[in-house]
Structure formats: structure tokens, C-alpha cells
A protein has these predicted regions:
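Active-site-adjacent "subsite" loops/lids of carbohydrate-active enzymes
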Residues: 178-182
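Positively charged n-region of N-terminal signal peptides that target proteins for export
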Residues: 1-4, 19
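N-terminal structural segment of carbohydrate-active enzymes
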Residues: 20-157, 165-167, 172-175
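Sec-dependent N-terminal signal peptides
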Residues: 4-13
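C-terminal motif of bacterial Sec signal peptides marking the signal peptidase cleavage site
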Residues: 15-17
Length: 182
């Protein structure tokens, strides 16, 4: 008797699960809600401005920086327009980035320095000459404002590295510290 009840139950289950009733599709209009920015959950992209993307080759050489440098020790052309192009293309959004940390953008020393690796310019942004001016190799104040506006429109924050402790190249005096300092 148990076998008969089990067989009838299984048959009923099988027959009802194979019905020809169609599933009705429901059209919904999803709403996008701006999520608050939370630094503890930020996905930060560290960006070396000069090395990222060259959006304007016309600003590649400024301040007479034409000396031949050691390999990868000179300016390579990355600039604000290049970063803006990548924001427009969705590069950062596709990676899930919501904050870009950029190397310093202030005007760098104009000449090169040899720290033992060959002629090197301040392409990295850490050899400040003028704290009140943007280095022309990276673009203008307007181009930087455009970059920030484009980033904000995509929910991306911009952070600038502020270097106050080591603002210039190594010198011969750097290793000479008074004995009571160490």
C-alpha cells in the first residue's frame, strides 16, 4: 500500500511540475540611488600622474626639460587630460574604483638631478619648486578642475598626495646628521 501511495504522489508531483503554464515577465523600472561615500569602504587607485596616460602631447616638454635622462627618469607625458579620458571611458568605474590618489601636481624643479642613477627630473611630483603653481607638464588649473568635475560626476573622489617631509632630491648633506639626532 505504501508503494501505491508513494507512486501516486510521485506521479502527481511529476505531472504538475510539467504543466504548460508560462511564467509571466514583469517589467520593472529599477531606480538608482546615490550611495553615500564611505572612506572605510573606498577602493583607491594610486596614480602616478606622469606615467598614467598622455592626453595632450603638446604639454610634454616645459621649463626647458630637454636633457636626455636615464631610462624612465624623465617626464613621459601623462597628464590631466589623459586621466580625464580614462574617466570618460569608464576605466576606473569598470574597476570599481571610487577614489583616485594622485601624486603631487605642484610645479617641480626645472632641472635634472643625478642621484647615482643618471639624470632624473621630478616626474613623480616629489621635488617641489612652487607650492602655489601646477606643473605645466600635467596641464592647467582648468584641466585639473575638469578632471575633478568628471570624476565627481561618476562618484569618484580625487585625493592629492601632499608631501611636506621630503620635498626635494637627495643631496650630499642628507646623510650627515648631528650625533644627538640618531
Amino acid at each position: 500500500m505504501k508503494k501505491i501511495i508513494f507512486t501516486i504522489g510521485l506521479s502527481t508531483l511529476f505531472l504538475t511540475s510539467c504543466s504548460k503554464t508560462s511564467v509571466q515577465s514583469v517589467q520593472t523600472n529599477p531606480t538608482t540611488q546615490q550611495q553615500p561615500f564611505v572612506w572605510n569602504a573606498a577602493n583607491v587607485y594610486f596614480l602616478l600622474t606622469d606615467r598614467f596616460n598622455n592626453g595632450n602631447p603638446k604639454n610634454d616638454i616645459n621649463y626647458g626639460r630637454t636633457a636626455e635622462t636615464a631610462k624612465l627618469r624623465g617626464f613621459e607625458g601623462g597628464d590631466f587630460k589623459g586621466i580625464s579620458q580614462k574617466i570618460d571611458e569608464g576605466y576606473f568605474s569598470d574597476l570599481g574604483i571610487n577614489a583616485i590618489w594622485m601624486t603631487p601636481i605642484v610645479e617641480q624643479i626645472h632641472g635634472f638631478v643625478d642621484e647615482g642613477q643618471g639624470a632624473t627630473y621630478g616626474f613623480h611630483g616629489y621635488w617641489t619648486k612652487d607650492w602655489t603653481s601646477i606643473d605645466k607638464n600635467w596641464g592647467s588649473e582648468k584641466e585639473f578642475q575638469d578632471l575633478v568635475d568628471k570624476a565627481h560626476a561618476k562618484g569618484i573622489r580625487i585625493m592629492l598626495d601632499a608631501v611636506i617631509n621630503h620635498t626635494g632630491p637627495v643631496t650630499n648633506s642628507d646623510g650627515v646628521f648631528p650625533s644627538d639626532w640618531v
